[in-house]
Amino acid sequence: MQGKIIKSLAGFYYVESEGQVYQTRARGNFRKRGETPYVGDIVDFSAEDNSEGYILAIHPRKNSLVRPPIVNIDQAVVIMSAKEPEFNSNLLDRFLILLEHKAIHPVVYISKMDLLDSPEEIKAIGRQYQAIGYNFVTSLEELLPLLADKITVFMGQTGVGKSTLLNRIAPELALETGEISDSLGRGRHTTRAVSFYNTHGGKIADTPGFSSLDYDIANAEDLNEAFPELRRLSHKCKFRSCTHTHEPKCAVKAALETGELWPVRYEHYLQFLSEIENRRETYKKVIKRK
């Protein structure tokens, strides 16, 4: 039989197949090979009834996230708050390049719009992201149609209202929500386990909130690919390996001068590129010491 793991708990994997859910375990040979089934995996399994079965094989994965481990994701809703905590375009772009690199379609959702005196600044930022090609939504009514026929994860900085949003989407989840800490200005982590839930014509999963992200982009070429607007322009650069920093006849810098490119995103690209180069230098020093 073939199915999808929709929940992992205490060594059991709950596999959905043809409308039924089977409780399974992974055979010992997975552990010997260093393989672990994850929520989202397509698996072959055997089961005589719903109470007990065994996973026999794991199909190849199209993508994965590691905190917590979840695989084969169609899209990710990145939740950013308009206020408390303040909207942070740098953090948003870190989420976006991670998702682009993982081939996961991003959707940007802005929470707490009601706390703003005027929504115009956020809406203006939204128009910039929409011009790049991203879905940028500020209401539940805009978000819900995007969930149909997709496996969707939700991510965002702690305290942005992720559990609150999920409870509005699927009240049966009854997820615990955390208040913002006055001393730190951050929310408490309130989500723990990961499961898929059927709702609004698709499947949704919860992931813990993050205040920072580590991305595994290792070079300028991969970083360029993670910025759609740079990716579209870079083939016009004189040099194929152009980093869009100092090279002559750079199409990205030309677009920046004409106003075609949003300066905020270019600044973030330069910052992330610098971080990648610094990590590479640190790694070289460590290797030399060995």
UniProtKB/Swiss-Prot annotation:
Start and end residues of each CP-type G domain:
62-213
GO biological process terms, alphabetically, are:
ribosomal small subunit biogenesis
> Could you tell me the EC number(s) of this protein?
3.6.1.-
Subunit structure, per the record? Monomer. Associates with 30S ribosomal subunit, binds 16S rRNA.
Whose protein is this, by species? Streptococcus pyogenes serotype M6 (strain ATCC BAA-946 / MGAS10394)
**Which enzyme class, named as a word?**
hydrolase
Q: What is this protein called?
A: Small ribosomal subunit biogenesis GTPase RsgA
Gene from which this protein is expressed: rsgA
The UniProt family comment states: Belongs to the TRAFAC class YlqF/YawG GTPase family. RsgA subfamily.
What CDD domains does the entry give? S1_YloQ_GTPase, YjeQ_EngC
The cofactor note from the UniProt entry for this protein is:
Binds 1 zinc ion per subunit.
Q: Which GO terms describe its cellular component?
A: cytoplasm
